[in-house]
Amino acid sequence: MSNRNLRSSTNSEFSEGQHQTPSSDSSGHGEDQPQASPGPNKKSHTPKKNISKGAVLHEKPMTVMVLTATEPFNYKEGKENMFHATVATESQYYRVKVFNMDLKEKFTENKFITISKYFNSSGILEINETATVSEAAPNQIIEVPKNIIRSAKETLKISKIKELDSGTLIYGVFAVEKKKVNDKSITFKIKDNEDNIKVVWDKKQHNINYEKGDKLQLFSFHLRKGNGKPILHSGNHSFIKGEKLLKESFEGDGYHKGPKQVVALKATKLFTYDSIKSKKMFHATVATDTEFFRVMVFEENLEKKFIPGNTIALSDYFGMYGSLAIHEYSSVSEVKSQNKEDSSSSDERLIEHLKICDLHLQTKERLVDGEFKVYRKSTGNNCICYGIWDDTGAMKVVVSGQLTSVNCEIGNTIRLVCFELTSNADEWFLRSTRYSYMEVIMPEK
């Protein structure tokens, strides 16, 4: 990589509610037994098909906002269908098991619905054919606080999961560290930034194909503590929604006719990279089904094309340092997507990010994007030197030019885009280039 060309002339469903209190059947084999606790508001003839043992009937209507819903899937070895959902009121959110496939359309994201005659099993709502679900009337619409929605998306730390009671149902999003396939089951070791735990998936339910680095979203897994070692085990209602890790692809230098059809994942803000000529640009990340590309966009009027979720076709672009460069003669056109998931949470798709330990093992210069914590800051001659770290190590970053005006302090989390990985003697470090972008990530309120 040419330093001369790169350098400027001045030189990316779950908290405590992610789990639930222990189910009445901690083994996971009786969650669909047709029993319910008696109560003054219950009718003895109410059918309890598919409802968990000990579930309590609630006849009073409750208005909720639908946050998410999975696709229907087979359980009981393919004999029955169900899907999982997450809903919220003004004060809390709930995990929901829905056994009536006629209700799938009602459980559409952001839709307000009123439910009654549902069951509550240890904090999880269960809805079968006897429940009543209808669209909420205008005067029934509720306002769900952002912190409730945010909490529903958070994942409880594995270290905290291990402290819960045996039988607790676990929901969460985790990365795959290892995978082992047996005759009757698939065993994963999943991890977060601090810990790991084993997950056992019964192959009678679904044969899933996810590997190291992929992301798994677990629904209704049972925490077991046999022999004193916690594991997560699938039950009758368990479901896994996976996401394959997108590998970075590098475009060869020079002109490319195209078209290349991709989905926009995310984009930076527009920024000035040449203050003398007042030239602006932005960076974007786009992806196919299996790989992602970094894009440098030098045309201001193309910002709306790169809205996350948009399917676009790129033509007449250039390969530049492995990235795609879009200039005034390039063509970016919107394409009507045939994939419903393209426009759903596309900016959250899992892409491969190099950790600092990986950067130290590189053998040649390259461009780097990433988010890191700042632990050190010092000011030099026309530059600022930062010390950054992640959970694998630390590295030096040298910032010069316009990026020295970014208000970044020790303790901040920063996003670096298009920084050059280079070396001085036997030390690898990052430095800003002509096209680098840097911003401080503010915590959500």
Curated annotation (Swiss-Prot):
Alphabetical list of InterPro entries matching this protein: HIN-200, HIN200/IF120x, NA-bd_OB-fold
Domain of life: Eukaryota
Result after altering N236A: Does not affect DNA-binding. Strongly reduces affinity for DNA
Consequence recorded when altering R376E: Promotes formation of a homodimer
Annotated effect of mutating K229A: Strongly reduces affinity for DNA
Result of changing H84F: Loss of interaction with TP53BP1
Induction line: By beta interferon. By IL6 in splenocytes (at protein level).
Chain intervals with Basic residues compositional bias: 42-51
GO BP: activation of innate immune response; cellular response to interferon-beta; inflammatory response; innate immune response; negative regulation of AIM2 inflammasome complex assembly; negative regulation of innate immune response; protein homooligomerization; protein homotetramerization
A single GO cellular-component term on record: nucleus
PTM notes: Phosphorylated.
Quaternary structure note: Homomultimer; homotetramerizes (via HIN-200 domain 2), enhancing affinity for double-stranded DNA (dsDNA). Interacts (via HIN-200 domain 2) with AIM2 (via HIN-200 domain); preventing activation of the AIM2 inflammasome. Binds to several transcription factors, including NF-kappa-B p50 (NFKB1) and p65 (RELA), FOS, JUN, E2F1, E2F4, MYOD1 and myogenin. Also binds TP53/p53, the hypophosphorylated, growth-inhibitory form of the retinoblastoma protein and the p53-binding protein 1 (TP53BP1).
Protein name as it appears in the record: Interferon-activable protein 202
Organism: Mus musculus
Source species taxonomy: Eukaryota, Metazoa, Chordata, Craniata, Vertebrata
Originating gene: Ifi202
